[in-house]
Structures are given as structure tokens and as C-alpha cells.
Amino acid sequence: SEPFRLYLAVKELSLKYVVITSVDRDDLEDYGAGHYAKCVEFLKSHVPDLRVEVLTPDLRGDERALERVLRAEPDVLAHNIETVERVFRVVRPQGDYRRSLRVLKFYSKEGSAPVKSGIMVGLGETKEELISTFQDLLEAGVSYLVIGQYLSPGRGYYPVRKHYSKEEFDELRDIALSMGFKRVLSEPLARSSYHAQEIAGL
């Protein structure tokens, strides 16, 4: 089973911190929440000192599915907002910006673990829209924020509208920290699982 295979990988690699994620599984009745929970529970029961972060899809905002993830007691709860609301409809038509915020808020209110989210820049957003999104995330209870550069996978995909400079990433980090985030990673190649243990402080 996958939980057991994850356990073997953790033991072989002597890992102390893992991030479990997946693609959307809207084809499953619980959107994959039960499998997330089984993986977390198996790992934490067999490797007691292991810290586990989950990076989940929105699970369609289904509270029963979200609650199932919470009951497994991961150490960090993550769901990526990805982009600002105006651009969200274009680049993630299958998703919903407000639903993602509701997921993050549910994790924050109903769970005990810190909540984390990630956003990509370079999709045509404005600085004002980024600041507004940061505020939305704070109001949803997000503590940790990751900001990275959007890189188009290739032809036929949404194009990169802007490449941010290191100075601009530093500025966004400083803005986010001043607004109240506890930890912020803001770098061109940063992704939500990048330096996850350091961000979590575990």
C-alpha cells in the first residue's frame, strides 16, 4: 500500500520531515481525503519523531473531507492560493479563489496546526492585488507564506507576464512580514514544498 511504501522511503532516507501532496482527485467520493489521512496516520504511528506536512487540493471545499485530513493531525496544513483573484479565474478555471480561502480558514479554525499557502507571481497581477491577496490569506488564518516565480511549462500554456527581480521578491517578503505573516519565503524558484522544514521551524 502507499502508506507503507512512504514509510519505507522515510526509513531508507532517514527523513525527519515530509510533505505529502497529490493531484486533484475529484473522481473519488472523498476527493482523496481518506488516503491523505491514512498516509499521515501510518507514518506518525510508525515514525513518532517524524513531522508531516500535507499540501492538499481544495477537496471541493467539502468539510467532511477537510475534517478527515484534520483528524490525522498533520504538523502543517497547506493549500496553495496560487494567484490573485482576478487572474485565478483564467489560470485555474476548475478552481475557485473564494473556495480556496474557505479551505484555509477551515484548516485554521478547526485544526491546531499552522496553516501555509503559496502564490506564484508573474501572471499579470499588480502589486496592489498581491497585497490584497496577502490580506485575504491573513484573514483566513494563514501563518506561513511562500512566494515564487511562475514559469510556463511550454507552448500552449499561460505565458509568463513578468519576471520579478530579486529585489522585488525581497520587497514582497518584507511587505508580507510587515502585514503579519510569521514566516515568508520569497524567491524566484521557491515552491510551497521548498525548504518546508525550515519554514515550519520544525
Describe every region a protein language model picked out:
Residues 27-39, 62, 86-87, 91-102:
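Active-site-adjacent beta->alpha loops and helix N-cap segments on the catalytic face
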Residues 24-29, 85-91, 153-159, 195:
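A short acidic, helix-capping loop that chelates divalent metal ions and anchors anionic groups
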Residues 23-25, 57, 81-84, 149-150, ...:
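Short, ordered loop/turn segments at secondary-structure junctions
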Residues 2-13, 17-26:
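Extended interfacial segments that mediate partner engagement and assembly in macromolecular machines
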Residues 18-38, 124-129:
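Conserved glycine-rich "GG(E/T)P / GGGxP" loop and the immediately following alpha-helix
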Residues 18-20, 52, 77-79, 145, ...:
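Hydrophobic residues within beta-strands of alpha/beta enzymes
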Residues 4-5, 11-14, 38-50, 64, ...:
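Auxiliary Fe-S-binding modules of radical SAM enzymes
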